Amino acid sequence: MAIQAQKGTKDMLPNDAYKWHYIEEKLRKISAEYGIREIRTPMFEATELFKRGVGETTDVVQKEMYTFEDKGGRSITLKPEGTAPAVRAFIENSLYADAQPTKMFYFTPCFRYEKMQKGRLREFHQYGIEVFGSQEASIDAEILSLVMRALTEDFGIKGLSLNINSLGCPKCRAKFNEALKQYLKENYDNLCETCKTRFEKNPMRIIDCKEKRCKEIVKEAPSILDYICEECSDHFSKLKAYLDVMGIEYNIDPQIVRGLDYYSKTVFEVIKDGLTVCGGGRYDYLVEEVDGPKTPAMGFGLGLERLLLILDEEGIEIPEPVRCEVYIGSMGDRARLEAMKLAFNLRKSGIKAEIDHLGKSVKAQMKYANKIGAKYTFVIGDSEIEENKIKIKRMSDGEQFEVSLDINEIVNIVK
């Protein structure tokens, strides 16, 4: 049996690559508009980073990570998300010593051993933004404005819902956890086994459980918004005011807690037809948790596979770039030498050029040129070389132009 791609992974083939380039280019552009610069972190990190950063009781750490021991006996994990590695890089490279805030974006593969679903694989790709050094609600609103602008204006997606919540700070969250435990006590026996372990350690994680029975139980659970302190409430009010002034519509959803333990205050999700397109929030204590200086932060992740799926389902076309601008057909060895020289010089002039490498007949060469969408074609043979003339054919309408074999003349026609 032939070796195949592993379950939950997918090849990105040449016919699809341009779609990825398109969305990445759009996201790079809007990142630059907000003064956000790129960071790239390693594919794997010390397992301890995710245990401490993401949270021991999360599904990600308990069930979904690809963890192995390397030859030096170190526990290594393929990164399941992009925030913790960005935090590690922020601390290790002393970026906190630079002028703040520090704004960074990334494109990264992530790995989670989870049940596959629509738009989600075990190896998936994320666009993420992390902003360090500001505790103001204005930065939260700024990032949310970027997200909604990118999705609605740059990509033209309709029917999106921006849902927001506040998880408060450790002080007000402790009060909420007690109220939540009181509520859950009477349904404790009906919780899944994982949530029973969470009941004492981290009851708020139960709200994020994917098990149907647990989802039913938490439907009537207390709202954390009834327990947040004055400072956190003020922060949330400012966030809403900033969104209002920018004309960004939102819904308040007290059941958004996100699947990772590091979030505090603002959390959000962008939903389309019941699926989360992207999500994130504030994590004011994570930098400190992984041995960095006290640093407030905010970020999010956007799944690129899911974004491409939505664009396809919405019928939003991604423009396919021209693959070949000029196809140079040739007859015989002498003509092939001339074709090679011309193609080389056309490419130097920034023109996409192709020649025959299979010794095909002229008819077969022209058929191939048509298949790859060549905009112009011409054929070189002995007579063309002797007369120093060729006829360039514009494929869109069949019009022909007679020019010399001079590279500048050819460029003037096809450029």
UniProtKB/Swiss-Prot annotation:
Main localization category: cytoplasm
Keywords: Aminoacyl-tRNA synthetase, ATP-binding, Cytoplasm, Ligase, Nucleotide-binding, Protein biosynthesis
Top EC category: ligase
Subcellular location: Cytoplasm
Coiled-coil regions listed in the entry: none
Swiss-Prot/TrEMBL catalytic activity: tRNA(His) + L-histidine + ATP = L-histidyl-tRNA(His) + AMP + diphosphate + H(+)
A molecular function (GO) term: transferase activity
EC number(s) from the headed UniProt entry: 6.1.1.21
InterPro entries linked to this entry: aa-tRNA-synth_II, aa-tRNA-synth_II/BPL/LPL, Anticodon-bd, Anticodon-bd_dom_sf, His-tRNA-ligase, HisRS-like_core, HisRS/HisZ, HisRS_anticodon
GO cellular component: cytoplasm
Keyword Signal attached: no
GO biological process: histidyl-tRNA aminoacylation
Complex and partners: Homodimer.
Annotated family: Belongs to the class-II aminoacyl-tRNA synthetase family.
Protein name: Histidine--tRNA ligase
Organism: Clostridium perfringens (strain 13 / Type A)
Taxon lineage: Bacteria, Bacillati, Bacillota, Clostridia, Eubacteriales
Gene designation per UniProt: hisS
